């Protein structure tokens, strides 16, 4: 059997069935066909590292096992063939799925599966979207987003993946996972109106609590806004009601960010994120309105903070005066001041 030297020291790295075992040989990843013996060797290799991960409680050893599994996939100097990747992805999928049910191994297992970046891992990624661990759900969503392009060649599998992501986003509570699922859905070639509406609902949940915890919400707001903008740029269509919902949330985030920014309540890192948030809001609002009236591309961390707030007030409106937003969407009220109830 042809074997490929991984560049790893073939020493004992795991305990299987109570005995020490050396790393099994792996077929050359560049091979153009897979024999029965090749398939068996690939399965043995994946199973070996899954068993090694299951047999330890040392997170650093789990990371070593994960690295070993991913080396054939990520070695750009020796690219793996498509036929190898299909067999390898299936083997990793089957070997590591059982580890998703173990709290000690679930995170390293899903990171391993997600970073194979092959559509053969779809079943495990979909299953992990309902895991009790938020970090596992995040990586499951990321993994599915990364393979949506491959799955588009298989419409039934592609639609199934999108349905799983949409169902997950509809019930997800964790802000970071919401952002991750929205980003995954934005990787679709033609995002659906439902995907965009769900992402906008997620953004609305961030906006409703924004005045209470702005530093915590800023990164997830920015990530979700970018995902929504990507969906819209790819043709996702919003109903008038969802447009209003989106503009209301974006205006709220834009206004509250500008208020915190002007007040000096953000540290240096948060200030940089705030500038990104303001620009992201403006860009998304322009995409929704098919205009260039909300853009804040000209601002940067050196821009006078009071001037930024005045500019934003002119766009979103404030408690004293209506803004451009109310001219276009009369039903969308101006955002409240930070001192008021959001």
Language-model segments: residues:
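Charge-dense, extended regions
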Residues: 323-342
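Amphipathic alpha-helical segments within extended alpha-helical solenoids and repeat-rich scaffolds
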Residues: 85-97, 159-172, 197-215, 243-267, ...
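Cleaved targeting-peptide boundary
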Residues: 20-31, 340-342
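Structural detector for internal amphipathic alpha-helices that build alpha-solenoid repeat scaffolds
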Residues: 31-38, 51-86, 104-118, 124-127, ...
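Bacterial N-terminal signal peptides that target proteins for export
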Residues: 1-8
């Amino acid at each position: 059997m042809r074997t490929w030297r991984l560049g790893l020291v073939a020493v004992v790295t795991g305990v299987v069935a109570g005995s020490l075992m050396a790393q099994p040989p792996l077929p050359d990843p560049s091979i153009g066909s897979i024999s029965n013996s090749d398939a068996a060797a690939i399965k043995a290799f994946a199973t070996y590292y899954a068993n090694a991960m299951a047999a330890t409680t040392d997170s650093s050893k789990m990371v070593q096992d994960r690295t070993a599994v991913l080396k054939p996939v990520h070695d750009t100097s020796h690219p793996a063939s498509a036929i190898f990747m299909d067999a390898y992805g299936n083997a990793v999928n089957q070997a590591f799925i059982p580890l998703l049910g173990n709290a000690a191994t679930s995170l390293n297992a899903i990171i391993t599966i997600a970073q194979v970046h092959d559509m053969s891992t779809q079943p495990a990624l979909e299953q992990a979207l309902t895991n009790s661990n938020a970090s596992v759900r995040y990586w499951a969503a990321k993994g599915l987003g990364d393979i949506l392009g491959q799955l588009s060649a298989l419409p039934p599998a592609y639609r199934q993946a999108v349905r799983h992501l949409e169902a997950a986003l509809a019930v997800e509570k964790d802000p970071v996972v919401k952002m991750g699922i929205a980003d995954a859905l934005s990787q679709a070639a033609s995002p659906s109106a439902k995907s965009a509406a769900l992402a906008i609902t997620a953004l609305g949940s961030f906006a409703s609590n924004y005045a209470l915890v702005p530093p915590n919400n800023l990164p997830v707001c920015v990530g979700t806004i970018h995902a929504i903008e990507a969906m819209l740029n790819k043709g996702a269509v919003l109903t008038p009601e969802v447009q209003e919902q989106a503009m209301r949330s974006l205006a709220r985030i834009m206004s509250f960010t500008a208020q915190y920014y002007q007040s000096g309540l953000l540290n240096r890192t948060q200030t940089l994120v705030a500038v990104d948030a303001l620009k992201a809001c403006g860009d998304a609002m322009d995409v929704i309105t098919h205009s260039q009236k909300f853009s804040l591309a000209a601002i940067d961390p050196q821009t006078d903070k009071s001037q930024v707030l005045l500019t934003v007030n002119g766009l979103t409106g404030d408690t004293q005066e209506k803004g451009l937003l109310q001219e276009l969407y009369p039903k969308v009220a101006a955002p409240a001041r930070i001192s008021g109830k959001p």
